[in-house]
Structure formats: C-alpha cells, structure tokens
Swiss-Prot record:
It is found in: Cytoplasm. Homodimer. It comes from the Bacteria. Catalyzes a salvage reaction resulting in the formation of AMP, that is energically less costly than de novo synthesis. Pfam families: Pribosyltran (PF00156). Its main location: cytoplasm. PANTHER family: ADENINE PHOSPHORIBOSYLTRANSFERASE. This is Adenine phosphoribosyltransferase. Keywords: Cytoplasm, Glycosyltransferase, Purine salvage, Transferase. One of its GO terms (biological process) is purine ribonucleoside salvage. CDD domains: PRTases_typeI.
C-alpha cells in the first residue's frame, strides 16, 4: 500500500536525518540517513515519494550506487516492478565488469557494473542517498552509458548545493532529482 506523498511532508524526512559533527573527519557535518531507514513510516515515505515520481516513466531497471543506493534503489525497483542493478566499488563484483574511475579529495576511486547488467536501450534510473561533489554519481552514469543504457534520471535524497555536484551531473546531460537540498556538509 502506497502512502500518498502529500500525506507527509518532505520536510519530515529532513527532520529525521541525523547530523553528526566532525565525522568522518574534523570539519564535516555528516548527514546520516539511517534513522529514516530504521523507521517503517519514514522509509515507506521515502520510497513512496520516489515511486510516485517514477511510476509512469517506463523505467526498465533501477541502478543503485554502493552502498546506501542499494537500499533505496532495491526498494524502489521492487515497488516499480523492475529489476535492480548494483554499481559497486571496484573488485566487489564476481562476473565480468566495466569500470569507471572518479576523483576523490585525495586520490582516485572506481566503481564497476557487470557487463550484462544493462541491455542496449534500457531506460535506467540511477539512485544514491546523496549528491556532494557528484563524482560517484557521474561515474555511475558513465557506466550506464558505456553499456548502452538511456538515463531516465539520477535521483538522491539529499543534494549539497555548495559542492556543485548537482550542477556537474546536469552539465553531463543527465537530469537530477533530489528530495532535499542543503547548503553543505562543511561545519562552521
């Protein structure tokens, strides 16, 4: 049973996100979505808000980014009655993969997807918990494109607007939807 999104405000989700100062390092205000996931009411609200947005968009598959994108994406795929594809950190998938690197603050990382995960022309929704600099999301989008998928949209719960990730994603040609926007995760 879907909860109509007007039944509760998106602001209620924002209130449920826990803020933790100086984690994972000094100067960062971490936004922890686990309280949303722990609450049946708020987890349902989160998924239902996304279901209502995408239920008429003819999505073939939902892809989720490691790791919180798995939780949201799999629940959303289930409700949309489509398959789910994990995009994992490099070295975690057992079958043949394609990889995409992205920049970190100090260095580089990579994500991978199975080569048979997205069929040519499939309409794909990419999901993660948040968008900061956009590096992971951009890498995921590039993987989907490499496999011939069509990006319906990239979606996240939260976007840190001051870090320009959303702007970078949109500049790549992918539409981006976020339920919440915040000025940033830098403390003080």
């Amino acid at each position: 049973m879907l909860v109509h999104p007007e039944a509760m405000s998106v602001g209620a989700l924002a209130d449920k996100i826990r803020k933790i100062e100086n984690w994972p390092q000094k100067g960062i205000l971490f936004h922890d979505i686990t309280p949303v996931l722990q609450s049946a009411e708020y987890f349902r609200l989160l998924v239902d808000l996304l279901v209502y947005r995408y239920m008429d968009q003819k999505i073939d598959i939902v892809a989720g980014l490691d790791a919180r994108g798995f939780i949201i994406g799999a629940a959303l795929a289930y409700q949309l009655n489509v398959g789910f594809v994990p995009i994992r950190k490099k070295g975690k998938l057992p079958f043949e993969t394609v990889s995409q690197s992205y920049a970190l603050e100090y260095g580089e990382a990579a994500v991978e997807i199975h080569t048979d995960a997205v069929k040519l022309g499939s309409r794909v929704l990419l999901v993660d918990d948040l968008v900061a600099t956009g590096g992971t999301m951009l890498a995921g989008l590039e993987l989907i494109r490499k496999l011939g998928g069509e990006i319906v949209e990239a979606a996240a719960i939260l976007e840190f607007t001051d870090l320009q990730g959303g702007k970078n994603i949109r500049a790549s040609g992918a539409p981006l939807f976020t339920l919440l926007q915040n000025e940033g995760c830098m403390k003080g």
